[in-house]
Amino acid sequence: PRGIGDENPPTAMPLRHEGLAYRFPFHTERKTYPYFDPIAQKPFDADYDGEEDVNGLSTYRFTQNVGVNGEGKPVAPITYPSLYGGNEDGKITTSAAMWGVPGEPNEQITMTRYYTAKRTFWVDPVSGTIVKESEQAHHYYARDGLKPEVTLVDYKLTSTRETVESQVNSARDERDRVALWSRVLPITFTAIGLIA
């Protein structure tokens, strides 16, 4: 990361990446998968949670809780991973007045930045395509991670109707390709082999 007015060129930082991202495997199973969280920079379980029809496509629904329980309450919030070596953006000390919290206005208070998220993925089990996604995330500062004090951002996002339609069409196209590669081509190659 660079500060304002930094004359040094930007540098790339490698990010270790474990778990799934952007899609699930072909022939997705009804089980738990590790799914990479880009904010926490590590994988968290995406648990199979049932089947659901999305625009005429039978999908598997998976839920992922990052630092929250099934109801969305903080149970183990993630300390926000810093982009700086000294964790300058992870903990901040300033006055109670600046934080906007009760107490002596000039009292210096140190708070840590935390993050929680709850996601739901609707996945085509044949192609592994995520056809719909919902995410609720909360970024906040607190002295105790289980007691948010200053909200940085709290949002809920869901795939748009247009995105869902596009992803369902992509999943259907991918299903056709999977069928071609797993059924038609092996039979064709076997027939060619027998003729030769």
Give a label for each model feature.
Residues P1-R30, A137-H138, L157-A196:
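Extracellular or lumenal secretory-pathway regions
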Residues R23-K132:
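Membrane-proximal low-complexity regions enriched in glycine and acidic/polar residues
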Residues G56, R143, P148, T188-A191, ...:
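Solvent-exposed, non-transmembrane amphipathic alpha-helical segments
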Residues G85-G86, T93-P186:
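Membrane-proximal extracellular "stem/stalk" segments
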